Swiss-Prot record:
This is 1-deoxy-D-xylulose 5-phosphate reductoisomerase. The gene is dxr. Pfam families: DXP_redisom_C, DXP_reductoisom, DXPR_C. Gene3D superfamilies: 1.10.1740.10, NAD(P)-binding Rossmann-like Domain. The lineage of its organism: Bacteria, Bacillati, Cyanobacteriota, Cyanophyceae, Synechococcales. NADPH binds at residues 10-13, 36-38, 130, 132, 223.
Length: 412
């Protein structure tokens, strides 16, 4: 049985991870949970999974959580009260929890960086759903992985697809996972993108896009932030940077293809011109399950893919006019150093302000480009962790400042 720590248990990745644990109780045991403010859901998760430690983001909620757990303990719905913690200390403790074999990092954004590093330093394997950690701090995370021997298993569908295609190759047989070493034997990878909420919109119509429009994904069920990232194609741009670190590829070896059906999750082109692809229904539970069960596969009762029911699979090149964030991500990745951290932080803050209706959808790439341009003269090619955290904070403040001076609030 594999013991699992779930960081971000009430979010999209966290809840799906716990669903899998419930489906396979003989395979997985949940030993640690971290969550935000959704106490009702956390209580249900504690009752179901009986973890050893629980941490909340907000310390002020600990008293209420403790009281409610005491009641459940008295009623024998909880066998043993878990250790209760809060804040950064609790998050890092859960990430490095002694009995955990695997840590699922489902926290959105750069907030997942420090607990990811805590897990790595403790020698834990990670199921990485928090791509921003690797993007912002790849120069720190990759050396930490090499030092600890931890393995980074990609939990998003695209990188999981590449990872699955590489099983049995020299890369998988001879390398520690995710050390950034060059991948022998293949020419390139092709990351597929659904095209997001606006794939059928004309570029000139995006000026009218609302928050509701941007958070309505045609294929996937995800959180609001990543759904907006899908709509801008920044999500795919960030995945390009992640793939660079995961598989040791140059940016010229990583291609983005629009595939509206989201059935082919990504492809690997080998040196001999063969192409390997991983197919499946657009369901995040499958890549999460593969992380949890790897190197084994588990039999599931989930719906089977029947291509005859789908009929056609279509592909096209992304429209750079409609998706300027894609090119911003390639540029930041090629610049290296602290530039991806600036890109990531600026994007996170810009999306946050858009979701608050502080400015328009089309302003997201404008803000990000302005902040990245401003950082060029201060680019640090070999940053420390403290320098990455400092530049992350700087970029967020710059987005606020820029938006107040240059952006008009959404009005339709």
């Amino acid at each position: 049985m594999k013991a699992i720590s779930v960081l971000g248990s009430t979010g999209s990745i966290g809840t799906q991870t716990l669903q899998i644990a419930e489906e396979f109780p003989e395979q997985f045991k949940i030993v640690a949970l971290t969550a935000g403010k959704n106490l009702d859901l956390v209580i249900k998760q504690i009752e179901t999974h009986q973890p050893e430690v629980v941490s909340l983001a907000d310390e002020s909620l600990l008293s209420e959580l403790s009281s409610r757990i005491n009641s459940l303990t008295e009623n024998k719905k909880i066998v043993k009260k878990p250790l209760l913690m809060a804040g950064a200390e609790g998050l890092n403790t859960a990430a490095a929890w002694g009995s955990a074999d695997l840590v699922v990092t489902g926290i959105v954004g750069c907030a997942g960086l420090l607990p990811t590093l805590a897990a790595i330093e403790a020698g834990k394997d990670l199921a990485l759903a928090n791509k921003e950690t690797l993007i912002a701090a790849g120069p720190v995370v990759i050396p930490a992985l090499k030092k600890s021997g931890s393995r980074l298993l990609p939990a998003d569908s695209e990188h999981s697809a590449i990872f699955q295609c590489l099983q049995g190759t020299p890369w998988a047989d001879n390398a520690r996972l995710s050390t950034g070493m060059p991948t022998p034997g293949f020419k390139s990878i092709q990351l597929t993108a659904s095209g997001g909420a606006f794939r059928d919109w004309k570029a000139e119509d995006l000026v009218k896009a609302t928050v509701e429009d941007a958070t309505s994904h045609p294929n996937w069920s995800m959180g609001k932030k990543i759904t907006v990232d899908s709509a801008t194609l920044m999500n795919k741009g960030l995945e390009v940077i992640e793939a660079h670190y995961l598989f040791g590829l140059s940016y010229d070896q990583i291609e983005i293809i629009i595939h509206p059906q989201s059935i082919i999750h990504s492809m690997v082109e080998l040196d001999d011109s063969s192409v390997l692809a991983q197919l499946g229904w657009p369901d995040m539970k499958l890549p999460i399950l593969y992380c949890l069960s790897w190197p084994s596969r588990l039999k599931t009762p989930w719906p089977r893919l029947k291509l005859t029911q789908i009929g056609n699979l279509t592909f096209k090149e992304p429209d750079t006019k409609k998706y300027p964030c894609m090119e911003l991500a390639y540029s930041a990745g090629k610049s290296g150093g602290t530039m991806p951290a600036v890109l990531n932080a600026a994007n996170e803050k810009a999306v946050e302000l858009f979701l608050e209706e502080r400015f328009k959808f089309i302003d997201i790439p404008k803000v990000i480009e302005a902040i990245c341009e401003k950082h060029k003269c201060d680019l640090n090619l070999n940053p420390s962790l403290s320098e990455i955290l400092e530049i992350d904070n700087w970029a967020r403040e710059e987005v606020l400042d820029y938006s107040e001076k240059n952006i008009t609030k959404m009005q339709f």
